[in-house]
């Protein structure tokens, strides 16, 4: 299945957009359903192999999921791949600096189902993500442009 890809122009520098879009402690500010998140870094600053933990409210419970950072090239590219749970996300964030000092943000998202997730991903999860992703990046844009 093709990734869900959304893009948006943000009137902030690439550095600001990248820092905000890849900080799991800020995900709850712009991603529907996220209630918390943090990085588990080995050396204080993010690097490939570190763990990104985000907690989403699903159904009647808060469920953490862990991803590994697979690419980290600030302020241009960040990728994570889910490593636990029945639904594992693969996320690629790309930020391009524009000549006017704004930034073009692209987020590509794919899911891999394990166990029950094999049924949920094509039936429910992908459809919901296609609906939410444009709203999420619009919220990110509004938050960055309105509060900085």
Regions found by a protein language model. Name each.
Residues 1-42:
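Hydrophobic ligand-binding cavity/cleft-lining segments
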Residues 3-5, 62-66, 88-92:
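Short, surface-exposed coil-to-beta transition loops
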Residues 7-11, 38, 68, 94, ...:
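Generic structural detector for well-ordered beta-strands
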Residues 11, 72-73, 98:
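A short, compositionally biased micro-patch
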Residues 15-18, 134, 138:
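Amphipathic alpha-helical segments that line or abut small-molecule/effector binding pockets
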Residues 38-86, 104, 116, 135-148:
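Glycine-rich portal/gate segments that line the openings of hydrophobic small-molecule binding cavities
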Residues 81-135:
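Beta-strand/loop substructures that line and gate deep hydrophobic ligand-binding cavities in soluble
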């Amino acid at each position: 299945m093709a990734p869900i890809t959304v893009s948006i122009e943000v009137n902030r520098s690439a550095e600001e957009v990248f820092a905000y879009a890849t900080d799991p402690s800020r995900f709850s500010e712009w991603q529907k359903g996220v209630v918390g998140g943090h990085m588990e870094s080995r050396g204080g600053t993010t690097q490939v192999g570190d763990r990104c933990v985000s907690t989403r409210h699903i159904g009647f419970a808060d469920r953490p999921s862990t991803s590994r950072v697979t690419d980290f090239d600030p302020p241009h590219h960040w990728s994570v791949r889910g490593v636990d749970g029945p639904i594992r996300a693969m996320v690629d964030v790309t930020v391009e600096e524009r000549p006017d000092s704004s930034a073009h943000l692209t987020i590509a998202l794919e899911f891999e189902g394990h166990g029950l997730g094999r049924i949920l991903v094509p039936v429910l999860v992908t459809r919901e993500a296609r609906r939410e992703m444009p709203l999420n990046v619009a919220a990110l844009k509004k938050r960055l442009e309105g509060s900085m």
